[in-house]
Amino acid sequence: LVMKNDIRFPVGVHYGEDMIHFFRYLNKIHRVVLLKSENYLVNMRDGSLSTSYYSFESEYECFQNCLSEMTAFVGRLDVSPEEQTELVWRNRTSDTFLRCVKCLYAGTSSYNYQKRLHLLRGIPKAYFLNFGRYFRPQGFSSKLITFLVRHRLFTLLLLTGSVYEQHGTLKKLIGWRR
């Protein structure tokens, strides 16, 4: 099926290429069974690609690819447009969107404050609304960041995000454990 449909890993994408490839594959098959349980465990550790950030442009491109492929896949299901939107944003798209936003304050961004605001303001409002509606954060800091993203409070988001990132770095430096 992969060779017949010439399904390839996306070129130039630094993160999520396996996810994008998977959705391209799903869009070519004719029968899919969806389960309510998650049988996929991501082993998150320091230094893994999943915990590293790339440029905003690279992260945003990954998000747009994910959104496009998920929308195409979910569009094949016999569900209402509202359910389609929920399925798209609850399954991986929200996480990928949050990475775009986080990369602007995660300590790897070389952009000045004005450029960061400009990039955030360039994202369509509907993305922020769908993210806020369907993303389910765990813990206070995630809930706070989600609130700031949903309501497009960019100045507070960049400030709060930077504080959280510096606090996490400080905890690692001193070897703080709970």
List each language-model region with its residue ranges.
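Membrane-interface aromatic/basic loop that binds lipid-linked glycans or pyrophosphate carriers
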Residues: 105-178
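All-alpha amphipathic helical-bundle segments outside canonical DNA-binding/catalytic cores
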Residues: 81-91
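Gram-positive cell-envelope targeting signals
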Residues: 13, 29, 34-35, 47-52, ...
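Non-catalytic, well-ordered alpha-helical scaffold segments
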Residues: 23, 91-94
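Catalytic core of nucleotide-sugar-dependent glycosyltransferases
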Residues: 37-46, 52-81, 95-128
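Residue-level signal for well-ordered alpha-helical scaffold segments within enzymatic catalytic domains
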Residues: 4, 24, 69-72, 172
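Amphipathic, non-membrane alpha-helical segments in soluble helical-bundle scaffolds
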Residues: 19, 56-61, 86-87
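Conserved nucleotide-sugar donor-binding catalytic segment
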Residues: 1-55
